[in-house]
Amino acid sequence: MHDLKAIRETPEAFDLALARRRLEPRSALVLDLDSQRRAVQTELNDLQARRNEASKRIGLVKKEGGDAQALVDEVAGIKATMAALEARLGDLDRDLDGHLMGLPNILDDGVPEGPDESANVEVRRWGTPRAFEFTPRQHFEIGESLGGMDFEAAARLSGARFVVLKGQIARLERALGQFMLDLHITEHGYQEVQTPVLVRAPALQGTGQLPKFAEDLFRVEGDFFLIPTAEVTVTNLVAGQVLAATALPLRMTAFTQCFRSEAGAAGKDTRGMIRQHQFEKVEMVSIVHPDDSAAELERMTACAEDVLKRLELPYRVMALCAGDVGFSARQTYDLEVWLPGQDRYREISSCSNTGDFQARRMNGRFKVEGEKGTRFVHTLNGSGVAVGRCLVAVLENYQNADGTVSVPEALRGYMGGLERLGD
């Protein structure tokens, strides 16, 4: 959600900010609705005062034994007019909120310009892709040859973009999630939370998935949606809350199933586990003081990088350009891991600073003791990391010529000391 006061004061700046995202100017429309709403509210306030005054006069006239019918009729007329204006005010509120809810966040000044992902800027890279003495296979070939990935069984059960994992590979995925969670809790200062995977629409509105991206969500019977990411539930833990400034920063992490319809992904990554309807992810969420959110984004990104470093997976960090930053974010770094089977880097984590955009939508605030009023918190979220894609990266980077897969040292304690899959 956007700050109406800021739009009133600097409408040109608001339109220029939207232009960075290749959007048409919207300040005139927003301010017109705002002006109409304020005019109706002023008229309602005036009528309220007239009604109160007339009601007092009715009491005085009746007390003196006079005829108050004219005043009674006047009050009735005022009430009827007010009812119509209140309905009009409700319509204007919904229209204004609808327009504001459909507009993306204002980008940080440091976000690179560009129309799409082709203009993203590499910030740094870590690790050197392994030189194979054989042609590396893709993860689904490895998984099927080890008897640990069954896409046909998943298709019989649920259709396309699902997988059944078995045996050592199922255990490896579980180990990855547990490793990530333990790392963030014990060394990165995050508190583990377990949240529902079913949420109501207001939670999705708060983080920005609704109303604009309804087609990307799975809706179940009743008022529930399956979460596309634990960002939704974990961030909404501060919805409607006023936190003490001393409680900030609040850092939380969750390991959940995630569900996405992949409505715009027809024909993309149709084989394997890169793009699925159901997948596991470890999510990091930070709730911070506005002055600290820029530094927190760097910290969060480093926490996600630490996962890949400890697994010794080569990766690069990309600063997303204006045309590629997500709806709710003001700035985003993507971590892309090297996949030798595809001979390319693929996204495995996205870390974003949303500023006060989500906080305004969900009314998450903080208060400094001794100061008047409250302020909106800043919220950040990041994958720490996508577990399924990390499994893909491990299988491809640690594959051996004999068809086995070496287990990264960081995971062997979670695998009962197992050193190789397929032995």
From Swiss-Prot:
Its main location: cytoplasm. Keywords: Aminoacyl-tRNA synthetase, ATP-binding, Cytoplasm, Ligase, Nucleotide-binding, Protein biosynthesis. L-serine binds at residues 229-231, 283, 383. GO terms for cellular component: cytoplasm. InterPro entries: aa-tRNA-synt_IIb, aa-tRNA-synth_II, aa-tRNA-synth_II/BPL/LPL, Ser-tRNA-ligase_type_1, Ser-tRNA-synth_1_N, SerRS_1_N_sf, SerRS_core, tRNA-bd_arm. It comes from the Bacteria. It is found in: Cytoplasm. Pathway: Aminoacyl-tRNA biosynthesis; selenocysteinyl-tRNA(Sec) biosynthesis; L-seryl-tRNA(Sec) from L-serine and tRNA(Sec): step 1/1. It holds the Pfam family Seryl_tRNA_N. Its EC number is 6.1.1.11. GO terms for molecular function: ATP binding; serine-tRNA ligase activity. One of its GO terms (biological process) is seryl-tRNA aminoacylation. It catalyses: tRNA(Ser) + L-serine + ATP = L-seryl-tRNA(Ser) + AMP + diphosphate + H(+); tRNA(Sec) + L-serine + ATP = L-seryl-tRNA(Sec) + AMP + diphosphate + H(+). ATP binds at residues 260-262, 347-350. Homodimer. The tRNA molecule binds across the dimer. Catalyzes the attachment of serine to tRNA(Ser). Is also able to aminoacylate tRNA(Sec) with serine, to form the misacylated tRNA L-seryl-tRNA(Sec), which will be further converted into selenocysteinyl-tRNA(Sec). Belongs to the class-II aminoacyl-tRNA synthetase family. Type-1 seryl-tRNA synthetase subfamily. Consists of two distinct domains, a catalytic core and a N-terminal extension that is involved in tRNA binding. NCBIfam families: serS (TIGR00414). This is Serine--tRNA ligase.
